[in-house]
């Protein structure tokens, strides 16, 4: 705990010093820091949630006795490196703008910056720029290209659309599961798990079942194979909503059983902004068939 929190507090302290360097008085510097604290909370609630533009955001880290800081720990240190580069630049700017002797206006201080930006300050600023640009670009690729960046409002909108589209099927009678067979290959250090299995279903509704509704909503796993004897895919919203409908030909008679086979995979790709997978970890993996 000590090292990561010390780094986080140091970055906040550097930002506070930077605000003081921009201000004509210490009270104005305090005021700017208060504005930053309020804005950081307000902007997140307005949808500005990306850790690459929320100062000092290092993501979520779950610490446990079994798994240490494996969940989110690597991403948090990459983000600290990114923000560390930016803090190096802020430190140089604060040093160059710091008032020495007779007080002068901020405009006059800014005018002197190019002449002062030589030697060690220039080198530190250049290194900070290189570190923040390189790590920031790589993290953006991991979070926005390899993974999908979705803000909370979009997730809520997607949930509302799901309810509007599929609420009509709420009371559709479906067969019950009587037996589950599941084979799992775990590769915890690679962040990967492969699943193969089957569900034995029985039509206990008292009436023929003409359609089978399949719901697979796991943001960390992909359904790679689904075999339903006599089933024809008539609705496929798997990518957006995890919902599929299969027409059964012939219809499933009362008391009849059916074996549905499937395969799926769970893979950790890059870094995600939507939260960490706390189920598949290096030590202490916990999975269920829900």
Where are these regions (language model features)?
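Acidic/His-enriched low-complexity segments
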Residues: 3-290
């Amino acid at each position: 705990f000590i090292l990561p929190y010390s780094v986080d507090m140091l970055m906040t302290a550097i930002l506070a010093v930077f605000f003081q360097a921009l201000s004509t008085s210490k009270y104005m510097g305090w005021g700017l820091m208060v504005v930053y604290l309020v804005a950081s909370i307000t902007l997140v609630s307005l949808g500005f949630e990306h850790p690459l533009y929320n100062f000092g955001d290092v993501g979520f880290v779950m610490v446990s006795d079994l798994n240490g800081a494996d969940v989110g720990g690597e991403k948090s240190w990459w983000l600290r490196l990114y923000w560390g580069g930016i803090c190096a630049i802020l430190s140089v700017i604060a040093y160059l703008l710091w008032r020495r002797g007779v007080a002068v206006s901020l405009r006059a201080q800014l005018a002197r910056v190019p002449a002062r930006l030589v030697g060690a300050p220039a080198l530190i600023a250049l290194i900070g720029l290189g570190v923040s640009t390189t790590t920031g670009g790589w993290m953006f690729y991991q979070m926005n290209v390899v993974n999908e960046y979705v803000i909370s409002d979009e997730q809520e909108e997607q949930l509302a659309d799901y309810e509007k589209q599929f609420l009509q099927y709420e009371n559709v009678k479906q067969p019950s599961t009587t037996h589950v067979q599941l084979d799992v290959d775990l590769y915890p250090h690679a962040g990967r798990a492969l699943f193969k299995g089957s569900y034995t279903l029985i039509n206990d509704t008292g009436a023929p079942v003409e359609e089978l509704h399949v719901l697979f909503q796991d943001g960390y796993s992909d359904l790679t194979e689904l075999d339903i004897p006599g089933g024809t895919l008539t609705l496929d919203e798997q990518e957006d909503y995890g919902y599929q409908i299969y027409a059964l030909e012939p219809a499933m008679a009362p008391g009849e059983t059916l074996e549905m086979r499937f395969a799926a995979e769970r893979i950790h790709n890059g870094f995600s902004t939507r939260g960490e997978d706390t189920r598949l970890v290096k030590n202490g993996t916990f999975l269920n068939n829900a």
